[in-house]
């Protein structure tokens, strides 16, 4: 994480137990942007490691067990690392993602070093607008999402890959026809997630049928 390390050395904040840089003003809720320059300057001393309360709240709250007393010791378990990245998420983490389209943020919400912010507006984006074969509906949803998180993050295939997992976790069989179609798409993450979601929904439906019988 070179950007985080650069910000730390620049004295912007401290490293929390969850591995994130925490600043006095914004906590860990900010984005680091680097700019290359040939201007030389001495790094301030205020960027030394330390300062985290080590209360363990983030470790207890992490749904995937990525954080422990040593910090973010198992980043491969952090579900945020596999959200909207266009990669196949490990099967053990797919259910843990729940109904999150992007971001987990649980470790940030429970951190006592986070400043209090007013709740932001909700995006109001429905899953049925993403898990659909209606291209105009999907395009409108992508445009809306792009306005909030940027076009780079809201790439159509990345969104489809994550939306497929949400469909699988939704328990709603109405998504099965779309997932059946997506399972044959050439984009690996979309196809694999769609197959997993289809199997999960089908199994859930079978279990409900057996209980009814």
Where are these regions (language model features)?
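Alpha-helix N-cap/helix-start positions at coil->helix boundaries
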Residues: 118, 156-158, 173, 188-189
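Short coil turns that connect the paired helices of HEAT/ARM alpha-solenoid repeats
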Residues: 84, 150-155, 181-190, 213
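Catalytic cores of enzyme domains
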Residues: 1-130
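Structural detector for internal amphipathic alpha-helices that build alpha-solenoid repeat scaffolds
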Residues: 160-170, 192-203
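Long C-terminal interaction/binding lobes of large macromolecular proteins
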Residues: 188, 193, 197-200, 208-213
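Alpha-helical adaptor scaffolds
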Residues: 127-157, 164
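Amphipathic alpha-helical scaffolding segments comprising HEAT/armadillo-like alpha-solenoid repeats
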Residues: 141-145, 172-183, 203-213
